[in-house]
Design a protein with these regions (language model features):
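Short, hydrophobic-biased segments on the C-terminal half of alpha helices
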Residues: 48-52
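Short, cationic-aromatic polyanion-contact patches
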Residues: 7-16, 32, 63-87
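A short acidic, leucine-rich amphipathic alpha-helix
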Residues: 35-38
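Pre-recognition alpha-helix immediately N-terminal to the DNA-recognition helix
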Residues: 17-22
Length: 107
Protein backbone atom coordinates (compact mmCIF):
# COMPACT_ATOMS: atom_id res chain seq x y z
CA UNK A 1 0.00 0.00 0.00
CA UNK A 2 2.84 2.34 -0.74
CA UNK A 3 1.71 5.90 -1.35
CA UNK A 4 -1.44 5.41 0.75
CA UNK A 5 -1.84 7.41 3.94
CA UNK A 6 -1.77 5.73 7.34
CA UNK A 7 -5.34 6.92 7.86
CA UNK A 8 -6.52 5.01 4.77
CA UNK A 9 -4.34 2.00 5.56
CA UNK A 10 -5.88 1.79 9.03
CA UNK A 11 -9.55 2.53 8.26
CA UNK A 12 -9.76 1.06 4.77
CA UNK A 13 -9.70 2.39 1.24
CA UNK A 14 -13.29 3.57 0.92
CA UNK A 15 -14.58 6.76 -0.73
CA UNK A 16 -15.71 8.37 2.53
CA UNK A 17 -12.36 7.59 4.17
CA UNK A 18 -10.47 9.02 1.18
CA UNK A 19 -12.52 12.22 1.40
CA UNK A 20 -11.92 12.53 5.13
CA UNK A 21 -8.22 11.82 4.64
CA UNK A 22 -7.94 14.62 2.08
CA UNK A 23 -9.93 17.06 4.22
CA UNK A 24 -7.83 16.28 7.30
CA UNK A 25 -4.57 16.64 5.40
CA UNK A 26 -5.74 19.91 3.81
CA UNK A 27 -7.63 21.28 6.80
CA UNK A 28 -6.10 24.76 6.54
CA UNK A 29 -7.52 25.28 3.05
CA UNK A 30 -10.97 25.35 1.49
CA UNK A 31 -12.00 23.71 -1.75
CA UNK A 32 -15.01 23.39 -4.04
CA UNK A 33 -16.64 19.98 -3.95
CA UNK A 34 -15.29 19.15 -7.43
CA UNK A 35 -11.70 19.66 -6.26
CA UNK A 36 -12.34 17.63 -3.13
CA UNK A 37 -13.54 14.74 -5.31
CA UNK A 38 -10.53 15.05 -7.62
CA UNK A 39 -7.93 15.33 -4.85
CA UNK A 40 -9.50 12.52 -2.81
CA UNK A 41 -9.59 10.31 -5.92
CA UNK A 42 -13.35 9.83 -5.58
CA UNK A 43 -15.86 9.93 -8.41
CA UNK A 44 -17.82 13.18 -8.27
CA UNK A 45 -21.17 11.35 -8.35
CA UNK A 46 -20.05 9.20 -5.42
CA UNK A 47 -19.05 12.28 -3.45
CA UNK A 48 -22.41 13.91 -4.22
CA UNK A 49 -24.06 10.91 -2.53
CA UNK A 50 -21.75 11.07 0.51
CA UNK A 51 -21.72 14.85 0.92
CA UNK A 52 -25.20 15.42 2.42
CA UNK A 53 -24.43 13.01 5.27
CA UNK A 54 -21.07 14.71 5.91
CA UNK A 55 -22.82 18.09 6.03
CA UNK A 56 -25.65 16.76 8.20
CA UNK A 57 -23.13 15.30 10.67
CA UNK A 58 -21.26 18.59 10.78
CA UNK A 59 -18.00 17.11 9.47
CA UNK A 60 -17.69 19.75 6.76
CA UNK A 61 -18.43 23.44 6.81
CA UNK A 62 -18.97 26.10 4.16
CA UNK A 63 -16.16 28.64 4.36
CA UNK A 64 -17.14 31.06 1.59
CA UNK A 65 -18.71 31.46 -1.82
CA UNK A 66 -16.74 32.83 -4.77
CA UNK A 67 -18.70 33.65 -7.90
CA UNK A 68 -21.34 31.05 -7.20
CA UNK A 69 -18.82 28.36 -6.20
CA UNK A 70 -19.14 27.17 -2.62
CA UNK A 71 -15.92 26.28 -0.80
CA UNK A 72 -15.71 23.77 2.04
CA UNK A 73 -13.26 22.37 4.54
CA UNK A 74 -13.36 19.99 7.46
CA UNK A 75 -15.18 21.43 10.45
CA UNK A 76 -12.42 21.53 13.07
CA UNK A 77 -14.97 22.72 15.66
CA UNK A 78 -16.89 19.43 15.34
CA UNK A 79 -15.97 16.94 18.11
CA UNK A 80 -16.04 13.96 15.72
CA UNK A 81 -13.81 15.75 13.23
CA UNK A 82 -11.46 16.67 16.08
CA UNK A 83 -11.19 13.00 17.07
CA UNK A 84 -10.53 11.97 13.46
CA UNK A 85 -7.75 14.56 13.24
CA UNK A 86 -6.42 13.31 16.59
CA UNK A 87 -6.52 9.72 15.30
CA UNK A 88 -4.59 10.73 12.18
CA UNK A 89 -1.95 12.46 14.31
CA UNK A 90 -1.73 9.44 16.62
CA UNK A 91 -1.25 7.08 13.67
CA UNK A 92 1.57 9.25 12.34
CA UNK A 93 3.32 9.31 15.73
CA UNK A 94 2.95 5.55 16.11
CA UNK A 95 4.43 4.99 12.67
CA UNK A 96 7.32 7.38 13.40
CA UNK A 97 8.07 5.56 16.67
CA UNK A 98 8.00 2.21 14.87
CA UNK A 99 10.47 3.45 12.25
CA UNK A 100 12.71 4.91 14.97
CA UNK A 101 12.75 1.60 16.86
CA UNK A 102 13.49 -0.35 13.68
CA UNK A 103 16.44 1.94 12.94
CA UNK A 104 17.84 1.48 16.45
CA UNK A 105 17.87 -2.32 16.22
CA UNK A 106 21.25 -3.44 14.86
CA UNK A 107 20.79 -5.53 11.97
Amino acid sequence: MEGTSLFIQTLGDYPAIRVLDFLIYSRDFDYPITEIAHNARVNFQTLKKLWPQMEQNGLVVVTRTLGGITLYRINTANPVAQKLIELNTFLCWQYAEKIEIEQEVPG
